[in-house]
Amino acid sequence: LQETVVLDDDTETMVSLVGKRQVPILVKDDGQAMLESMDMVRHIESIGAPVLTGPERPEIAAWENATAPKAAPLTQPRYPLLGLPEFGTVAALDHYTIRKRKTLGDLVELRARTRELLRELTPRLEELDRLIECPQAVSGALSVDDVRVLPVLRSAAVVKGLRFPDKVRRYYETMMDRLGYQPLPAV
């Protein structure tokens, strides 16, 4: 697989591939574009020997669905500060800031409310701490559950002052190391 970064203001590329402004997009070898993340995961799993063989637990999907809205006001205002490639031009960075201001509010004000917003996210992380079965895989063996949880944690880890509960921290560190990912900076 080859990764290509689409600048945040490059709506034309997104629309030409999938008919709307959305990422990530997976373009398969036959040229067909896929838009839904879990469809992409299942497609990639079908290419070789399956890796995500563990159980899918409904409580993990429920955790993700309940946690993502709590994390967004903390994480998304920080993305412009991280030097991410999708904000590689002033126009792309401005585009993101304007878009997020419309949906979340003022990004500087949201960053100033970090302590308050962390109080809302912390119970979700404590719940995950109770759900994690082992540091190597949230449900005991690698599964789609890990694909649901790890991106939320990787995003949340950009929040300076956030402390993961013990099992969450061990899981996050183990998975990042296992995948060879460097954590994003905390700001």
Model-derived regions, located:
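GST-like domain detector, emphasizing the conserved glutathione-binding G-site
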Residues: 1-95
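A structural signal for short coil/turn segments at secondary-structure junctions
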Residues: 18-21, 132, 179
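Short, mixed-charge aromatic SLiMs
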Residues: 67, 170-186
